[in-house]
């Protein structure tokens, strides 16, 4: 089981703070979040951490991993 935590606009827009899912690759996580209504565009620009370390959309996951997804910060 993987714990997925959302932060920033991803959390605000989706209303999802945390989900527990079965996944072996980041693609599985992203597919699950799109099924929950988060757009591919919003997910494409997000920062991905696995167990607190920078990761990519091609990363492999292991039971007990914590995936954190954050929307990029913008200002102006």
PLM regions: where:
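Ubiquitin-like/PB1-type beta-grasp interaction modules and other compact soluble beta-rich domains
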Residues: 1-75
